[in-house]
Structures are given as structure tokens and as C-alpha cells.
Amino acid sequence: MTGFTSHGPYSGTPTTIGAVMANTTLATAIAPLPPNPTATYYNAQGVLLNPAPAPYTPNGGLGTNGTEPRYMVNSDFDFESIALGLYQEWIELDLFNNGLAVFSEEDFLEAGLTAEDRAYIAFMAIQETGHATLLTNMLGEAAPVQCTYNYPFRTVREFIDFNQKITRVGESGVWGFINHLDSREVAQMLSQSIATEARQQMSFRQMLGLHPMPVWFETGIPQSWAWTFLSQYISSCPANQTRLAWQNLPNLFVVNQANPNRLSPNDTAPFEGYVGNRTLDPAYSTIPSNESCVNLNVTGYNCGPAIARNRSEPLSFPGKQVNLTWQAPGLAIGPNNSYVTSTTAGQPQFVAWVSQLNLTYTPLTLTGNYSGYTYQPASEVYQGDPAANDTMFIALTDSDIFLTPFNLSMINPHVVALGLYQAG
């Protein structure tokens, strides 16, 4: 879609409720197992240990035996993962074009963005046509189609902020599942697509006056996390739309979320970090001019568009008290209000901070049935790389289960609510 399209909340009655389910479900959760007993390779000398199948071709690897590639999903896991990715590509195609249609040239100029910047965003939308075509072809005739969407932004700054958040979800969602795909051929194509998504996310951060890449590693998240974030902005889909199997988790909100539009980003009113009641909503940009950093031509404080910004007052810091509220499960959400938020977790006890390669827990102090607080951790990935930075993810959990990037999805049964944290 290009130009202005119909957008707004869904007002009808859903004809289907809940995620798509298999005919049989074998267990309530995936049980943790010890390391793979065949994963024993170790090369202490740095020499070839096994016969080479051909010259200049070390032994091993997947899909390296000469078999002709088949660029199609190869399991239910593959199908549901790529279908989720296609939902993401469709909304981005509509979103980028919609912002260009609803805001004038003058609106963009007030935000410091020129005709060249608008052309750049238009080209990103064109990129999404290619991504959507690729994923559709790898899914076949049951591939999801484009839907109608409900966006939260009211200004160009809020449009850009929403873009940097939704592309963060798109990128991190793929990093979370790409190495679990049964089809290595599909993973190859997807990796060459998501590399472009990463550049889009960085570009929108630059347009918002944030540091383009303040981390050493990008974050991967489970599919149910990506779907939880994304589905809130899909108003309705065609009646025969392919549905998804992923869980919709309850929303978690940061009451004192940093506002990147502010001269002092932590001096925010409660819930100023959201223009609405959805977790990827942009921060309020309509603040008094003497409190705004947008047109402030002072090094260290200006947050107008730039290749890079280094703010004197960071958006967050270790030890910051983070005030939280969250929703109860059972909320109708997503396309046609046909999905329902759910959780299998017990009482929340911890806040999980998911950023870069790290999963860090901090204790949660409850202040009510659906409110509490914690403190931003000072954890590092490696020395000199604070883990909590960038546009990252937080979750309430009932335990502090040890997990790593490759098996992070095993946290899902323990998640009470899920949110996004604007750390930097």
C-alpha cells in the first residue's frame, strides 16, 4: 500500500478467538535437557582433524554436500516463524508509506528532516516490498497478506520513534529464531533480508537524535515476544487470513520511561514515555519548547537528526529506579481482536533484562496487584560494554531461570508480562 490508507482500531466482533493450535500438544512446556552429547568437537591445535570432502573445504557444515537448495519452509516451526516475519514486513511497508502521506513537507522540516530524508524513508518502504515478496514465496499460497493497522503517532518525531521501536522488534525477532529454522536455505535468505532491517533501525535512531548503535551485540527475542509487540498495532485482517500459533503476553509498562525528546530525558511525567496504552507507543513529543532538545543547538544536548549524538545526560543509568505497571491476562488483542493475552507464570518476583548477549534479573518489589519497581542493573556483557543500553526488552518473571541467547524462548512459561525499555 502507498499513500493514505484506512487506519484505526477494530470495532467489529471477532469470529475466531486465540492462537492457532495443533491437533495434539505433547507437553505443557519444553523440558530442559543437558548439552547435546554429540557436541564434543574441540580443536586445541588449530589444524584439520577430519578428512576434507574436497579441496579447500573443511569437514562439516550444514547444506554443504552439494544438494540443490530448496527455498521453502520445512516444518511447522519454519512456517509460523516466517509467517510472523511476513506480518512484520507488511506493517512496515504500510507504516513507512503512511507516515509520508499523513505528514507534510513542513512537518518533516520542523523535525529536522529534509526531502532527502523523506526519499530515504520512501526507499525503505520499497525495500519492504522485496522482503514481503521473498517471505511470501518461501511460504506459498497460505502466506499472510497485508492487513489494516492502527498507529499511535501524532507528529513526525513520534512517527520516527515508533519506527525505531517497531524495527527493533522486527530485527530482534528474527535474530531470536533464525538459527533454529529447519530450512537452512530459508535462513540464508532471511539473514540477507534482516541485515537491511538492522540498517533501517539504526537510521531511524539517527533521525531521532539517538546514538545509532550504542551496543556491541544486537538482541534476539522469542517469536511470542515479537508477536506480542507487533499484534497490538494490527487492527484487522481479511477473514481468510493465516493465523499464528505464537503466544500474546500481557503488557508491561515503564511508568518513568525516558523521553528522548526531552532536554533532561529522565525528568518525565508518569507514562510520558507512551502516547497511548501499547508497549511500542512513542514518547510524547508535544512538550514545552524550553524542555525540548529537538532544536537545541548545544553539543551534548541537541537531539535533532544526526549521524551520531552523544548526550551529556543519558536516557538511563545503572541504579535508576524503574517503576512498573502491567496488565492482567485475558485481554482481546491483535487482528480483529481475535487473539487473547495469556500467561502460565506464577506471581512475579523478578524483572528480566534482555539486551545484547545477556539475560539479567533484578528483584521486583511489589507495590500493588499490578505495580512494582526495580533498579536498572549495572551488568556488563564484556568489560566496558554495559548490557542495558539501546532499545531493549524487559519482562516480569516468576523465577530467575538461567538461559542464554540460543534457548531464551524457554523463559516464556515464566513470563508474567512483557515490555520495551528505552535504555539509550
Predicted regions and their residues:
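All-alpha RGS (Regulator of G-protein Signaling) helical domain and cognate RGS-like helical scaffolds
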Residues: 2-424
